[in-house]
Amino acid sequence: MSKVSFIGGGSFGTALAILLAEKGNTVSIYNRDKKVVDDININRRNDKYIKNLQVPSNIKAFDNLEKATEDAEYIVLAIPSHTIRSICKQLKNKIKQETIIISIAKGIEEHTDKRLSLVIKEELNNPIVVLSGPSHAEEVVLKLPTTLVVSSENMNAASEAQNLFMTSFFRVYTNEDLVGVEVGGAVKNIIALAAGILDGLGYGDNTKAALMTRGMKEISRIGSALGGKEETFYGLTGMGDLIVTCTSNHSRNRKAGLLIGSGMDVNKAIEKIGMVVEGVKACKAFYELKEKIGVSMPITDILYKVLFEKKDPKSGIEELMLREKKSEIF
């Protein structure tokens, strides 16, 4: 059995920590919030992020990063995309070189437009694995069948991570296309936010089906331009993740969009969700990136205007519908 440290004690990080603890691993969780740490250690709960959950006794929480990661064989980065670099800087020279870093964050770094595995690589000289795919913490803790993907430049490390997480209800595939896996997981949050806005505006299944299908095209278009393989975008980390995030009541991106579509101010909607809405950051980052490299992403264009230029969401949908006529396949 292994020693695994989770950085971040949010809902999905906690769900995965419980999965690994129940497999017999020694698991630690780092969280800056002393109340979360005490809730885990004393009450064996984490009510701030996921209620009615029993945390196993072989999980220990810390508010000290160095103690939480001491002698860890695996470190799971279960934190928002914008905090990845700062955490990795803190880990530098404090962890073993053979420790495998597993990122479950989805997004790209603002201002640099770098995929998160590249951000980690710039700060740490460790094997890096990305775990991604269609999954919500609420279903993982109920042991409902879930299937994800691990990817890495080091496929031996990916295979280790696959073995670490694999259970009878949690199936993990490997995929060598790291670019495709990361881009699919990041861009689908943009489309999910837009899907929520459609729901908030009262549009129907026809409209959402069109949005998701054309959203898949945007994922494929930007992903291919960045070096990803098209078949990856139609797999678990692209289409699979898009479906679950656009349709599930567990999806915080969809829920934020629902509030915005219902008339709530963007910042108030994010505040009401109470957790990071990665689609907002991803929309800004990918809007800037596609402008630089010349990739067409009309849904991202409209969502950017809604989020950052106060465009009326309904007029944004009309603008999409009135775009120049063209063939579906291009």
UniProtKB/Swiss-Prot annotation:
Which keywords describe this protein according to UniProt? Answer: Cytoplasm, Lipid biosynthesis, Lipid metabolism, NAD, NADP, Nucleotide-binding, Oxidoreductase, Phospholipid biosynthesis, Phospholipid metabolism
- Recorded metabolic or biological pathway in which this protein acts: Membrane lipid metabolism; glycerophospholipid metabolism
Q: Does the keyword Transport apply?
A: no
Main localization is: cytoplasm
Recorded catalytic activity of this chain's protein: sn-glycerol 3-phosphate + NAD(+) = dihydroxyacetone phosphate + NADH + H(+); sn-glycerol 3-phosphate + NADP(+) = dihydroxyacetone phosphate + NADPH + H(+)
So what EC number does this one have?
1.1.1.94
Q: Which residues cross the membrane?
A: none
Q: Which residues bind sn-glycerol 3-phosphate?
A: K106, G133, S135, K188, D241, S251, R252, N253
> What InterPro entries would the database entry show?
6-PGluconate_DH-like_C_sf (IPR008927), 6PGD_dom2 (IPR013328), G3P_DH_NAD-dep (IPR006168), G3P_DH_NAD-dep_C (IPR006109), G3P_DH_NAD-dep_N (IPR011128), NAD(P)-bd_dom_sf (IPR036291)
Give the record's GO CC terms: cytosol
Q: Which residues form the active site?
A: K188
For molecular function, the Gene Ontology terms on record are: glycerol-3-phosphate dehydrogenase [NAD(P)+] activity; NAD binding
Give residues annotated as binding NADPH.
Answer: S11, F12, R32, K106, A137, R252, V276, E278
Q: Which GO terms describe its biological process?
A: carbohydrate metabolic process; glycerol-3-phosphate biosynthetic process; glycerol-3-phosphate catabolic process; glycerophospholipid metabolic process; phospholipid biosynthetic process
Per the record, the domain of life is Bacteria
In which compartments does the protein localize?
A: Cytoplasm
Question: Which PANTHER family does the record cross-reference, listed alphabetically?
Answer: GLYCEROL-3-PHOSPHATE DEHYDROGENASE (PTHR11728), GLYCEROL-3-PHOSPHATE DEHYDROGENASE [NAD(+)] 2, CHLOROPLASTIC (PTHR11728:SF1)
- UniProt function note: Catalyzes the reduction of the glycolytic intermediate dihydroxyacetone phosphate (DHAP) to sn-glycerol 3-phosphate (G3P), the key precursor for phospholipid synthesis.
- Recorded family membership: Belongs to the NAD-dependent glycerol-3-phosphate dehydrogenase family.
Q: Which NCBIfam families match?
A: PRK00094.1-2, PRK00094.1-3, PRK00094.1-4
State the name under which the record lists this protein.
Glycerol-3-phosphate dehydrogenase [NAD(P)+]
Q: What is the native source organism of this protein?
A: Clostridium botulinum (strain Alaska E43 / Type E3)
Q: Which gene encodes it?
A: gpsA
